[in-house]
């Protein structure tokens, strides 16, 4: 079971840079990053409207959603910032550089999240191997971004 989850995560990892490259190209075609982001998120919104139509009985009530802590509703905002940023940054530094920096940022933040058990995550303390991994990753980021 864990192998399937790992393969799924790997496949998503393959798609993240593809999303950025597609959105950057779309931005050039439609006049800019804001327009491209709007089109991109409209497509995603449409998919979830369709899914919601088939799974409407499991949707939370409006009162439940508005009673949630605001930070729990920030995922869409963060996703919007990511998409807009990829459209602007990828043409400047390339998909590889962008992805390397994204992964480096993700690794740093997730090590901190795990170390402190943020939002109920299982606590996984920072250790020497994790620090060495971060150093190696940042070395790779520097090498990938060198001309």
Segments predicted by a language model, with ranges:
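Membrane-interface interhelical linkers
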Residues: 1-11, 25-28, 33-34, 42-71, ...
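Hydrophobic/aromatic residues within the transmembrane alpha-helices of Major Facilitator Superfamily
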Residues: 10, 14-18, 46, 77, ...
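Hydrophobic alpha-helical transmembrane segments of multi-pass membrane transport proteins
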Residues: 14-18, 22, 66-93, 143
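Structural motif at transmembrane-helix junctions in multi-pass transporters
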Residues: 29-32, 85-101
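Hydrophobic/aromatic residues within transmembrane alpha-helices
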Residues: 36, 89, 116-118
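Hydrophobic core positions of alpha-helical segments in small-molecule transporters
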Residues: 39, 101-102, 129-132
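Alpha-helical transmembrane segments of compact multi-pass small-molecule transporters, enriched
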Residues: 43-47, 101-116, 135
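Hydrophobic transmembrane alpha-helices of multi-pass small-molecule transport proteins
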Residues: 127-145
């Amino acid at each position: 079971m864990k192998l399937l989850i790992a393969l799924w995560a790997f496949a998503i990892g393959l798609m993240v840079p593809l999303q950025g490259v597609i959105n950057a190209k779309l931005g050039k075609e439609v006049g800019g990053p804001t327009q491209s982001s709007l089109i991109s998120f409209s497509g995603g919104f449409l998919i979830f409207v369709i899914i919601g139509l088939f799974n409407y009985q499991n949707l939370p009530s409006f009162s439940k959603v508005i009673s949630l802590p605001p930070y729990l509703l920030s995922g869409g905002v963060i996703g919007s910032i990511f998409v807009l940023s990829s459209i602007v940054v990828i043409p400047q530094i390339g998909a590889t550089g962008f992805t390397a920096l994204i992964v480096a940022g993700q690794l740093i933040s997730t090590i901190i999240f795990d170390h402190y058990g943020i939002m109920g995550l299982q606590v996984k303390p920072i250790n020497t191997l994790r620090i060495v991994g971060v150093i190696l990753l940042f070395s790779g980021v520097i090498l990938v971004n060198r001309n």
